[in-house]
A protein has these predicted regions:
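Alpha-helix N-cap and loop-to-helix initiation/capping positions
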Residues: 58-66, 93-100, 134-142, 180-183
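Auxiliary Fe-S-binding modules of radical SAM enzymes
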Residues: 106, 112, 119-205
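Catalytic cores of alpha/beta
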Residues: 25-30, 91-107, 170
Length: 205
């Protein structure tokens, strides 16, 4: 039944899902896999933002409460880690939303976080809003401010596996302010050094 997971070279199973799709029956299966094979289990949940007004606007179909409920269900099981996906420049969000999201992930003791810079794919409703001027994307500098504030409010031990998204240029009408992700990373690191900023600087627990 769990033959594939028990192969010698497999050390972890990572399952990406929505927070409102977390069910005890699914977690029981993953726990059985973990116990019988010793393979680690990582669950990746897409929160995107703690601002439920924004989540509603972009038709996520869930709010912050569902995310918290899903995390608490997972934490009843031993041997599971939780990775959360966050977008810090969603239309309508502010610096305060980035800070609130960081504080919530810290309070919930999330293990891993992946930050995504918003990209707007062609032929989507968001693309239509963007081209019609219904939404605007914050500046690169404002995104840096949000990332820095976010990082300062999460603990040093929370692994950060991503800072920017990537998508082929031909598939999007907006992506990373027309700049390559590695250049953005270098700019961000330079700004953090200049501000004497670091992960966990304002995290007190």
């Amino acid at each position: 039944k769990y033959e594939a997971a028990g192969q010698r070279d497999i050390v972890e199973i990572s399952v990406s899902t929505r927070p409102d799709c977390i069910k005890t029956a699914y977690l029981d299966i993953l726990e059985e896999v973990h116990q019988k094979t010793g393979v680690a289990v990582n669950l990746e949940l897409g929160l995107q933002t703690a601002n439920y007004h924004t989540l509603d606007k972009i038709n996520r179909g869930h709010g912050l409460a569902e995310f918290i409920d899903g995390v608490l269900q997972i934490k009843e099981y031993r041997g599971f880690t939780i990775c959360t996906h966050v977008i810090l420049n969603l239309p309508g969000d502010t610096l305060r939303d980035a800070e609130e999201t960081a504080r919530i992930l810290t309070a919930l003791k999330i293990d891993i976080v992946k930050l995504h810079s918003l990209y707007i794919a062609k032929n989507t409703e968001l693309c239509e809003w963007y081209e019609n001027g219904r939404i605007a994307v914050c500046s690169k500098e404002e995104y840096f401010d949000r990332v820095i504030a976010f990082l300062e409010l999460i603990p040093e031990g929370m692994a950060v596996e991503r800072l920017f998204s990537r998508v082929p240029e031909e598939e999007a009408v907006f992506s990373n302010w027309g700049t390559s992700w590695w250049k953005l990373k270098d700019e961000l690191m330079e700004r953090m050094e200049g501000q004497h900023s670091y992960q966990g600087k304002r995290c007190h627990y």
